């Protein structure tokens, strides 16, 4: 869990609209060549091994033929605190899907619900029908590592999927205050005047994944301080289903 020390030690994702520690790091960090090289290696390893937040499913997805633009819309759990504090006019998955569909009538729109919402979508016929009115297809048990290489754009509210898409060089549109939005890497549907600095993706990785967090790795029954590469390199196979890494802000 990442905590924001600037506002009462509350979780950072609950303080999206206020100054926070990570934003301060990204605004002020002076990135060295060694830091950026480390970030490049880490990013390339993540992408090369197909690692995402949710792993384990090997189902494949085929991009439709003769379609110029495919947009992936990624839903969230609507009770997520980041949606309470980090969005403005669009606060629901249906609202996001409608906005994307209405603004991109020429695109093939793929909707990926959050894994915890997929079962609800499957079991609620009326809700499923309403969502399907605004997309060309909905996919559930398919990983982002399978989808992202095959789409042109990703649209999110505050989902971490937008960050994962940036790691893979995709165009990302944000409809909320994500930690990775506002730095010149995304198309931002809400203003973020507190972030005037322009970053590239490796500077974002260096700040958000290396400089800001503190990592603890459980190895042989002992918890040790580490960097993000160590557990990744030591246990790629097991990390796909059982993450071996915890992060906490000191």
Model-assigned labels for residue ranges:
Residues 1-250:
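Catalytic-core helical/loop segments in enzymes performing group transfer/polymerization on anionic/lipid-linked
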């Amino acid at each position: 869990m990442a905590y924001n020390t600037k506002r009462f030690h509350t979780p950072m994702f609950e303080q999206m609209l206020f100054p926070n520690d990570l934003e301060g790091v990204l605004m002020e960090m002076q990135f060295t060549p060694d830091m950026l090289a480390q970030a490049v290696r880490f990013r390339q390893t993540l992408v090369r091994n197909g690692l995402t937040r949710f792993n384990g499913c090997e189902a494949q997805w085929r991009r439709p033929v003769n379609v110029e633009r495919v947009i992936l819309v990624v839903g969230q759990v609507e009770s997520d605190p980041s949606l309470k504090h980090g969005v403005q006019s669009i606060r629901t998955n249906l609202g996001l899907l409608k906005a994307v569909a209405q603004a991109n009538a020429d695109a093939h729109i793929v909707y990926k619900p959050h894994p915890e919402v997929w079962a609800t979508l499957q079991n609620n016929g009326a809700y499923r029908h309403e969502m399907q009115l605004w997309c060309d297809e909905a996919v559930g048990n398919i990983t982002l590592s399978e989808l992202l290489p095959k789409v042109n754009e990703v649209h999110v509210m505050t989902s971490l999927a937008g960050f994962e898409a940036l790691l893979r060089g995709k165009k990302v549109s944000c409809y909320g205050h994500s930690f990775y939005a506002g730095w010149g890497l995304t198309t931002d549907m809400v203003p973020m005047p507190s972030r005037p600095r322009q970053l590239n993706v490796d500077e974002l990785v260096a700040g958000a994944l290396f400089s800001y967090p503190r990592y603890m790795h459980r190895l042989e029954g002992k918890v040790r301080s580490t960097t993000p590469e160590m557990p990744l390199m030591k246990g790629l196979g097991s990390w796909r289903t059982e993450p071996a890494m915890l992060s906490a802000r000191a």
